[in-house]
Amino acid sequence: MRTSQYLFSTLKETPNDAQVVSHQLMLRAGMIRSMASGLYNWLPTGVKVLKKVENIIREEMNKGGAIEVLMPVVQSAELWQESGRWEQYGPELLRFSDRGNRDFVLGPTHEEVITDLVRREVSSYKQLPLNLYQIQTKFRDEVRPRFGVMRSREFVMKDAYSFHTTQESLQQTYEVMYQVYTNIFTRLGLDFRAVQADTGSIGGSASHEFQVLASSGEDDVVFSTESDFAANIELAEAIAVGERQAPGKAMELVDTPNAKTIAELVEQFNLPIEKTVKTLIVKGATEDAPLVALIIRGDHELNEIKAQKHPLVADPLEFADETEIKAKIGAGVGSLGPVNLNIPAIIDRSVALMSDFGAGANIDGKHYFNINWERDAAMPEAFDLRNVAEGDPSPDGKGTLQIKRGIEVGHIFQLGKKYSEAMNATVQGEDGKPLVMTMGCYGIGVTRVVAAAIEQHHDERGIIWPTDEIAPFTVAIVPMNMHKSESVRAFAEELYQTLKAQGVDVIFDDRKERPGVMFADMELIGVPHMVVIGEKNLDKGEIEYKNRRNGEKQMIAKDRLLAFLAENVKA
């Protein structure tokens, strides 16, 4: 491609509204332009990268035995009503009516559509297992689109769905897809972790996320220092260690009028934060217990996903408001604790091991110090309620936990019969009777992969694509003063035609621009291999080569240039 015939839309300045590196560089490199909040036009450079990522995904999915299909973006509301998600899905689901006043949605995912398709097309157990996938646009009406294409409203996704007669068959395909995803992200050159995860609104049983490690990530990824254990922080089990010590002091009621938070209590009374607890009041799941207290250590964070799995806690978890709390307990949120508490309580496992600790007295402006279980308050049920912390023991007993930020780029689920039962998706079994199909679901955020690759691989000059396979161009020809030097123009033209004929994705910068501008643009868009042709070097029989990844420069004999590029460039 010649730059003179290309839409080359680089920017010198970083737009003010771009918060993360990938958004900044995708705008500056001329990959995307915003049309509206969370909606982007993809320009030629961006499309080239996107299609290369799609092709890698497609190749690996095909190797794994999946078959490509294409389903409509617009979906019938009847299918969503049949599955039960019409009522369950929140405002992210864009709903509209056609001219016949029939309800439709703009698809955020395709479980309903694929289940409907397969129940129509597959009738016998002999046709299973079956794994179908598509690469297609999705729409989710995010309340706060941000970070460019990392969290946009419209995005490209690869979603696959498998259908089985048994759980064992699903498990086999799940393991194949786990390996396919590992192959995809390895081939993309990403530093990633496959982690155990919560199934969320998709539903199902087993689930793994594929997280690209990056400081700008929205998820906390937890992994062991000495084993393969890895999990999303939402799912990582917190292990309580040690034994509860015997009481050391008598319980004391203390005036704390200016201590509304744990931080204020610790500072004003010089208490170790790990010797305090905080009491959080949430809505209960039953009429008998409309409010429930969750008690965790002062230095720990509540894990809402874990908490809402307790049978006493409403799912989804909802915090009680101040009015409800005061009406029931008689004190505000800054003065709550386990002593004389008149609602059911659940304590974190670590709280069960505490002694001589401080907590609110359920009287405004007062706290109890030196509380001990059984002596001062009945021991409630202990449950895993908290997020793990850096340095906690690994749940598998090997090593301690590290926590890093991650960008979720892939997610695989064992759906089981959640959708097939709801939508009566059956085949004839071996015994001739109807058999409800068992399903799996496997997604990759294609547009997010592009952003994640940039988050991991960039420098002050621009993008550094982790592999030649996804760079918009693999080789840049930069002829200096070509329009004034016939020898430079002729050599550059010959090299361009030769590389094109060899199938190399090459960009020929034939603009009448200063060399510095040309270099900066090619580095900004991340072309991994740059060939710089200057008249003086050409007269000496040499060509300058620059490697974008390691920054190295070297002079190559011009008669060896093609052989050198063949050895170093992945076409």
Curated annotation (Swiss-Prot):
Protein origin, superkingdom: Bacteria
Compartments, as annotated in UniProt: Cytoplasm
Alphabetized Pfam families for the sequence: HGTP_anticodon, tRNA-synt_2b, tRNA_edit
Keywords: Aminoacyl-tRNA synthetase, ATP-binding, Cytoplasm, Ligase, Nucleotide-binding, Protein biosynthesis
Gene Ontology terms: biological process: prolyl-tRNA aminoacylation
Catalytic activity: tRNA(Pro) + L-proline + ATP = L-prolyl-tRNA(Pro) + AMP + diphosphate
InterPro entries for this protein: aa-tRNA-synt_IIb (IPR002314), aa-tRNA-synth_II (IPR006195), aa-tRNA-synth_II/BPL/LPL (IPR045864), Anticodon-bd (IPR004154), Anticodon-bd_dom_sf (IPR036621), Pro-tRNA-ligase_IIa (IPR002316), Pro-tRNA-synth_IIa_bac-type (IPR004500), Pro-tRNA-Synthase_IIa_type1 (IPR023717)
Gene Ontology CC terms, in alphabetical order: cytosol
Molecular functions per Gene Ontology: aminoacyl-tRNA deacylase activity; ATP binding; proline-tRNA ligase activity
EC number: 6.1.1.15
Assembly and interaction partners: Homodimer.
Function comment: Catalyzes the attachment of proline to tRNA(Pro) in a two-step reaction: proline is first activated by ATP to form Pro-AMP and then transferred to the acceptor end of tRNA(Pro). As ProRS can inadvertently accommodate and process non-cognate amino acids such as alanine and cysteine, to avoid such errors it has two additional distinct editing activities against alanine. One activity is designated as 'pretransfer' editing and involves the tRNA(Pro)-independent hydrolysis of activated Ala-AMP.
UniProt record similarity statement: Belongs to the class-II aminoacyl-tRNA synthetase family. ProS type 1 subfamily.
Swiss-Prot/TrEMBL domain comment: Consists of three domains: the N-terminal catalytic domain, the editing domain and the C-terminal anticodon-binding domain.
HAMAP family: Pro_tRNA_synth_type1
UniProt name for this protein: Proline--tRNA ligase
